[in-house]
Structures are given as C-alpha cells and as structure tokens.
C-alpha cells in the first residue's frame, strides 16, 4: 500500500486486518525522505518502483496487488506501468491526477491549504521548503482529537465526522511520523506530483487492471481528479461514489477495494 502525502509508514489496524482476512500481507514502504528512508532529491513518481521491487524481493513476494491513497495513488499507478506481470492489479483511493493533465484544472476544488502548498511547489524548492517547515511544526505534535480541526478547509463535513476515535489516532500518528526526520519526503512528493511522472496513462492501462475510487465530498483531491483518471486510464474500472470524502473511503471502502483487486488479478 502506498500512503498519502504527508503520511509516514504507519498502518491502520482495521486495514491490516482486512488484508489478513483475504490472505494478504499489508506492506507499507516509507518513500525516500520519510522516516528513516534516505531522501532521493529529484525523484519521479516512477522511481518508487525501484524500492517496491527491492522490498518485495527481500520479503520473497514475487507478485502483488497495490492500492495508493491520495498522494499514494500515482505511485500505485507507477507499479502497474513499470512492474507489469509482477503487479497484478492496482487501485487508486482518492488519488491525484497528473498536474499537466489535459482538460483538468488541477487545483480547482481543493481546500485553501492545498492550493497554497502547491502554489509554493510551483514557485520553487526554497519556497516550498519554507512553507512545509512551518506546517510541519504543527504536525509534529498533533493528536487524534486535533486532527479534524487541524486539517482546516481540507476536510469536508463527511471527513470531519469520520476523523474520530481510533481512526483519528491513526491519522495523527501517521502525520507525526511523516515529519519526524524533517520534510524532505513531503517536499519531494509534491515536486514529483507537479513534474513528469515518468510513465503514461496508456502504460498504466496496459500494465495491469486498474480501479479508480473517488468520492465527491473530497476537499483534498477533488472529484475531478477521479473522473479524469477514470476517463484516461484505458480499461479502468470507475468507482465514483457520491457522499464519500477523502478520509471516509479508507473506512467504508477498503475491503471492497481489496476484493476488487483480487478479482481483477484472478485471485478472488
């Protein structure tokens, strides 16, 4: 599984349980710059497949299915494009579309905080780093009860209602972990998103079966990103869900996403 941005290598127990119930191991890798993973400045989205292949080799896993949540979405698509035959199926869960996607206003519909963040990314590394360092100071100590309000305009009413209890504690732990050693991972994720990803949507569709999951109550990655991906990844199965937000998909749909991956891979 590819976590979002900025999210450290922290597993949500109900997700791990859902995977285990289906005979799957839930594996989460820290992308370069997160946690104890060495930064890789200038990395592209496609570069994640080097690390995925190395980790799976070490674990003795010759084949896999993958899901990417939010900023993890592009990295799941990279696996479909760059590891055909080994990646048997891929899904995005509220995943971002390419920054230069034709016909897509990438920032439209995002919460103010995301707009400010990616405007800084476009302005350059120095401006982005300054912005992220300021934001990281709050994330470094955030607690579960603070998550819903701390995300500001990035949470819809649906997501705010979901950000409670065990799920909120998981989100807080993942945010704290993401900036424990600095903001290099977050910075390089953002810069990779607004740059060439290193593969095409045609390569994604040719590499493995793909499913696109998206809710219309998402202020982090708007509905338009999901509809664009569904229309431009050849053969993609579209699961465009009214009433779902960015966070709620992880609660309500994760089991169904895994079931879909297994069925698409011929393992269901």
Q: Each predicted region: which residue ranges?
A:
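Short beta-strand/loop motif that positions the catalytic acidic residue
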Residues: 206, 212-214, 218
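Alpha/beta-hydrolase
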Residues: 110-199
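Conserved hydrolase catalytic core segment
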Residues: 63-106
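Conserved acidic catalytic loop of the alpha/beta-hydrolase fold
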Residues: 47-65
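Active-site loop/turn elements of alpha/beta-hydrolase fold enzymes
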Residues: 31, 95, 241-243
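Catalytic active-site module of serine/aspartate enzymes centered on a nucleophile-bearing elbow/loop
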Residues: 233-268
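Conserved HGGG/HGGXW glycine-rich cap/lid loop of the alpha/beta-hydrolase fold
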Residues: 1-38
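Conserved alpha/beta-hydrolase "acid-adjacent" motif
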Residues: 219-225
